[in-house]
Amino acid sequence: GVNGQMITLYDKSSHIPLMWTHLIPATLEGKAMHNVQNAMFAASIAFSMGVSLDSIRQGLRTFDTSFFQAPGRMNVYSEHPFKVILDYGHNAHAVGVMADLAQRLDVGNRRLVVLAAPGDRRDEDVLDIADAVSGKFDIYVLKRDDGLRGRDADEIPNMMAGRLRSNGIADSAIQIIPDE
């Protein structure tokens, strides 16, 4: 379709166009594919429970990813000369989804990512998070999480930096922030 895809419900032989994905605020004009999927699931579940089409459309039109409706989940801040997307991606898949979204967004200059991971993550999970962003940003800012959970203060950021380097990211593109 024009500017996006249509979410369509199928009920037996009925084809019910529901809403263009680019009109759903939580999809960032259809670019946040994970939220397109979430909208599809929510719409189909609501429809199967007998919720009216108008109510489903209203719900999709009015739900966004602001801090007030979804704290820590793809919160977009545009008050600066640049855009910030804050998401508490708690595993490599979630971080990868955000990295993929960043690739689909038009940016004026460069893409920067800030990464942290709690200390209770397995080493391989931390490395997978670094892999999920490798090559998708211009600058990689690594910081420690407040939850060290038995790890040394900069162990996680240093582990991520090592993986980024082994994935071909230049030292000049990697910054470690030891403390805020």
Say what each PLM segment does.
Residues 10, 89, 114-116, 143, ...:
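Generic beta-strand/beta-sheet core signal
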Residues 130-180:
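C-terminal helical cap/extension that packs against the catalytic core
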Residues 16-139:
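Nucleotide phosphate-binding/pyrophosphate-handling subdomain across enzymes
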Residues 4-12:
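Short polybasic amphipathic segments
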Residues 13-15, 156:
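Short, flexible, mixed-charge acidic loops at enzyme active sites
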